[in-house]
């Protein structure tokens, strides 16, 4: 416990320089993580409880790349207006990390703005079955992108929170966008597991660790992304869930 607390203190000190922007919409918060990389957090209610959803956007010399989308269409315009106000650039690309509304919900909106929209073929198949708006462009599980002066990689680690969850890696900044396969350090459980593959989840997390051993920051999909124990905590939550399931059988 003491070791964990010391680690959290060091990490907290590392975040003291984060710049938080004041937004007109109280359900949107934007924080600068790296030179051109920003974490945006939006809030919505699920089964009567308010949750935070985290994702990132990258400002490039060509325009803004948005990973996932604000959680709730009532926040879409406020979000893109805020981006243009801060950076004087438009969103030119949007990538959904899986099919749920807090990730793929903005595909149609961003597409109408003229942005190129992307998802994996697996995510596209799920969205098609659910009669939901889909990305214009699809790719197999893994893909490297270069937008202007920025390179990043989409990686499929395996099943976990959903069958189609992917993560996004920004190598220059050593930032991993974990999406919902990575639980925040303050999560009490695995959250919504109605479409989860819990027995595959551990290996998928190990695949992430092996693929990206030099991560500096992990942005978890929900709640406190600044607690950088999220990867290990996710493994602990999976183990706890499996032990409880075994005990109940």
Curated annotation (Swiss-Prot):
Cellular-component GO terms for this entry: periplasmic space
Chief localisation class: periplasm
Residue positions binding substrate: 183
Subcellular location: Periplasm
Substrates-to-products reaction catalysed: a beta-lactam + H2O = a substituted beta-amino acid
EC top class, as a word: hydrolase
Positions with a binding annotation for Zn(2+) 1: 98, 100, 161
GO MF term set: beta-lactamase activity; zinc ion binding
EC number per UniProt: 3.5.2.6
Classification via Gene3D superfamilies: Ribonuclease Z/Hydroxyacylglutathione hydrolase-like
Keyword annotations: Antibiotic resistance, Hydrolase, Metal-binding, Periplasm, Signal, Zinc
Essential cofactor(s): Zn(2+)
GO BP annotation list: antibiotic catabolic process; response to antibiotic
Signal peptide: 1-22
Cofactor stoichiometry and binding remark: Binds 2 Zn(2+) ions per subunit.
Organism domain of life: Bacteria
PROSITE patterns: BETA_LACTAMASE_B_1 (PS00743), BETA_LACTAMASE_B_2 (PS00744)
Subunit structure and binding partners: Monomer.
Family: Belongs to the metallo-beta-lactamase superfamily. Class-B beta-lactamase family.
Described purpose of this protein according to its UniProt entry: Confers resistance to the different beta-lactams antibiotics (penicillin, cephalosporin and carbapenem) via the hydrolysis of the beta-lactam ring.
This protein's name: Metallo-beta-lactamase type 2
């Amino acid at each position: 416990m003491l070791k964990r607390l010391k680690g959290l203190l060091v990490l907290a000190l590392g975040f003291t320089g984060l710049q938080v922007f004041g937004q007109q919409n109280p359900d949107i918060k934007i924080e600068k993580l790296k030179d051109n990389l920003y974490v945006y957090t939006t809030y919505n209610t699920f089964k009567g409880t308010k949750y935070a959803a985290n994702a990132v956007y990258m400002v490039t010399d060509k325009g803004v790349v948005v990973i996932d989308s604000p959680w709730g269409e009532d926040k879409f315009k406020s979000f893109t207006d805020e981006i243009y106000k801060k950076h004087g650039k438009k969103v030119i690309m949007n990538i959904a990390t899986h099919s749920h509304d807090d990730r793929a919900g903005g595909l149609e909106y961003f597409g109408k703005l003229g942005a190129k929209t992307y998802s994996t073929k697996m995510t596209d198949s799920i969205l098609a079955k659910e009669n939901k708006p889909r990305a214009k462009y699809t790719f197999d599980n893994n893909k490297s992108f270069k937008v202007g002066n920025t390179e990043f990689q989409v990686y499929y680690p395996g099943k976990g929170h959903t069958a189609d969850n992917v993560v996004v890696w920004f190598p220059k900044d050593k930032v991993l966008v974990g999406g919902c396969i990575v639980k925040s350090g303050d999560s009490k459980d695995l959250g919504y597991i109605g479409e989860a593959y819990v027995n595959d989840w551990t290996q998928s997390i190990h695949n992430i660790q092996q693929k990206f051993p030099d991560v500096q920051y992990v942005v978890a999909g929900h709640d406190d992304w600044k607690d950088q124990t999220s990867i290990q905590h996710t493994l602990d939550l999976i183990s706890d869930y499996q032990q409880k399931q075994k005990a109940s059988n």
